Amino acid sequence: MKDKAYDITIIGGGPIGLFAAFYAGLRGVTVKIIESLSELGGQPAILYPEKMIYDIPAYPSLTGVELTENLIKQLSRFEDRTTICLKEEVLTFDKVKGGFSIRTNKAEHFSKAIIIACGNGAFAPRTLGLESEENFADHNLFYNVHQLDQFAGQKVVICGGGDSAVDWALALEDIAESVTVVHRRDAFRAHEHSVELLKASTVNLLTPYVPKALKGIGNLAEKLVIQKVKEDEVLELELDSLIVSFGFSTSNKNLKNWNLDYKRSSITVSPLFQTSQEGIFAIGDAAAYNGKVDLIATGFGEAPTAVNQAINYIYPDRDNRVVHSTSLID
């Protein structure tokens, strides 16, 4: 289906995309955010939700979740002119009369200008690869942890052997009823000190085992079947929640279909963040230019310039002088 025209469509709902949407709202234009994941926030929200970030201006420290919550709260001021589309991957976009037609895996969208803020590309969790896994996902099977308290008093099973798996196991030790870590190797890939703490903890370690099947009722998993590597031994683990910590894969596979100049996995832009196609801009990690510093703070600075240039492109005859927010918001 093809929807109404928006002034600016932002591809990517991470920190840079969210701030760009806020600034566009500040400038009085309509905005649509298209995000490939099931939630906003990008890498800080998904990959390190509980870890501290120290390089955001005016915040000595804050977590990925806190950063995301603040940006969403900031954007909510303009919810009447902002539309958010989740679980949509942008496949192609084409120049049409009055703007661009954007085709995703779900729908066709129309926009007068586009700002690409998709970071290093769409990323997705590495799954167990088991039948019925998708049925349990986001019910009691999780690929990342946002709130540790949601696992209070539960039997939690964690699959994985990296830093995140070990960190979550240690963090949940005193919150959950029990924590069991399943890893396909005897050796863990996490920091040595963390592994030492894990081995000295009350967390149950099952190595080397691999997941073989999930059993449950409806949308809730109840048991994980695991098998010892190179042996016939099979165990069934009862669980209330299952955390799969195999990491995430990133991909800009659709970039080649966007007909834009790019280097490696980033889009080449001008000093005003214009891509090789007029009316399309790129910011954040998605943008490549000489001297680029890949920081969230850098992307925050790029967003207003890209938004202002997009507005100039859409409304060239309008008085587009930039006004400070103190003059616009009481």
UniProtKB/Swiss-Prot annotation:
Q: Which UniProt keywords apply?
A: FAD, Flavoprotein, NADP, Oxidoreductase
Residues bound to FAD: 35, 43, 48, 90, 123, 285, 326
InterPro entries (alphabetical):
FAD/NAD-bd_sf (IPR036188), FAD/NAD-binding_dom (IPR023753), Fd--NADP_Rdtase_type_2 (IPR022890), Ferredoxin-NADP_redctase_2 (IPR050097)
User: Per UniProt, what is one GO molecular function of this protein?
Assistant: flavin adenine dinucleotide binding
Q: From which residue to which does any coiled coil extend?
A: none
SUPFAM superfamilies assigned to the protein according to its UniProt record, in alphabetical order: FAD/NAD(P)-binding domain (SSF51905)
What is this enzyme's catalytic activity, as reactions?
A: 2 reduced [2Fe-2S]-[ferredoxin] + NADP(+) + H(+) = 2 oxidized [2Fe-2S]-[ferredoxin] + NADPH
EC number(s) per entry? 1.18.1.2
Give the cofactors, semicolon-separated: FAD
Query: What binding details are noted for the cofactor?
Result: Binds 1 FAD per subunit.
Subunit text: Homodimer.
State the family it belongs to.
Belongs to the ferredoxin--NADP reductase type 2 family.
Q: What is this protein called?
A: Ferredoxin--NADP reductase
Query: What is the species listed in this Swiss-Prot or TrEMBL entry?
Result: Streptococcus pyogenes serotype M1
